[in-house]
Design a protein with these regions (language model features):
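Helix-loop "lid/cap" segments that line or gate small-molecule binding pockets
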Residues: 14-20, 43-58, 153
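Short, acidic loop-to-helix structural element flanking the phosphoryl-transfer center
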Residues: 70-111, 115-122
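Substrate-recognition "cap/lid" segment bordering the active-site pocket of phosphatases
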Residues: 110, 115-167, 173-191
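Short amphipathic alpha-helix with an adjacent loop that forms part of the alpha/beta core around
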Residues: 155-158, 230-240
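Acidic, Mg2+-coordinating phosphoryl-transfer loop and its flanking beta/alpha structural elements
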Residues: 168-222
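Short acidic-hydrophobic, aromatic-tinged amphipathic segments that line or gate anion-handling sites
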Residues: 221-230
Length: 240
């Protein structure tokens, strides 16, 4: 939850489905699908929406290429300067000071992202200016809610530190289920699921409240008002 993807990944998902079917799913329909907890991968989500709409299903690689064309607008492995796609429409939700604050509060940090590595590295390293940030991106581990990536990252960050608490912040049911599954696989650690509603809902009080309730129902331990609010939560935990 460090960038607003309503105009990029969500838009590419809509455009991909429309490309194959002529039907453009509404944001609320995508939210409902994501709320099921198993469609964190936007390629899979695109295929599932096509299936439910009764549209012929394309070959997976063909769909990935179409999606990538909308999202990157160029070769994902090429220089970001050559990209002309929706990735250029991603307002940042945080700045680099957040991670310095987290470090100052005594916590290590890293990222488990469902984004392709070029996209994740671009936002973390070039836009936020983070140097070699700990990152598990698409392809480095199975898609969430499989906890492998979170378990791997937490092991790397906590190894030798003596710390036993892991807090993971996400904005989907799949993120919460990832924490729950990690807890089942590694019960010796304290796992905390932090959740936040995606920014496209922040100006829709009723929809946001309903979305946050779904996150709570899925097992979120704490609902935050924004990603930047994580430092307030960390300070509050230090006082208890």
């Amino acid at each position: 939850m460090i960038r607003d993807v309503a105009g990029s990944y969500r838009r590419a998902l809509q455009a991909t489905v429309e490309h194959y079917s002529g039907w453009r799913p509404l944001p609320a329909e995508i939210d409902a699908l994501k709320g099921e907890g198993q469609w964190n991968n936007d390629w899979d989500a695109s295929i599932e929406l096509l299936k439910r709409h009764g549209s012929p299903l394309p070959e997976r690689q063909s769909l990935i290429d179409v999606f990538s064309g909308f999202y990157f607008g160029g070769d994902p492995e090429a220089s970001p300067e050559t990209w002309s796609g929706y990735i250029g429409d991603e307002p940042l939700l945080v700045d680099a000071s957040l991670f310095q604050s987290i470090h100052t509060l005594g916590w290590s940090w890293g990222f488990v992202s469902g984004a392709e590595p070029p996209s994740a590295r671009f936002v973390l390293e070039q836009r936020l200016g983070l140097e070699s940030p700990p990152l598990i991106a698409m392809g480095d581990a199975p898609d969430k809610p499989d906890p492998t990536g979170l378990l791997q990252l937490s092991h790397d960050l906590l190894s030798g530190s003596g710390a036993t608490t892991v807090a993971y912040l996400g904005d989907t049911v799949a993120d919460i289920q990832t924490v729950i599954r990690a807890k089942a696989e590694w019960p010796g650690r304290t796992w905390i699921s932090l959740a936040v509603a995606p920014p496209h809902l922040h100006h829709q009080p009723a929809e946001r409240s309903a979305y946050e309730q779904r996150l709570k129902d899925a097992g979120a331990d704490h609902i935050l008002t924004s990603t930047m609010a994580v430092t307030d939560w960390l300070r509050s935990t230090a006082q208890h």
